[in-house]
């Protein structure tokens, strides 16, 4: 049986893998501006909790319009993506979004900011 720390590492590793699959398949949108432009087809939005208010407002509007949940990460999303400058990402594939949301919900560093349905 795994302790809480080991389970959290497993969830982070799973999320990192799902984000990697999304990158390789082109089913991810990176950056608040691009997410706000795309909106349609977005299934899950992930962002750093320390994003600027304007960018966060745009992500919330994109989440509301697309019906996608928006989760804020108390860490660096870019590190999970291996692209340090990235502060927001949106998954477009339904199955990857569901799997990623499962890993996000199990993690302690994530908070639901805006509800939605994948």
List the model feature ranges, each with a label.
Residues 78-117:
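C-terminal structural segments of small proteins and small subunits
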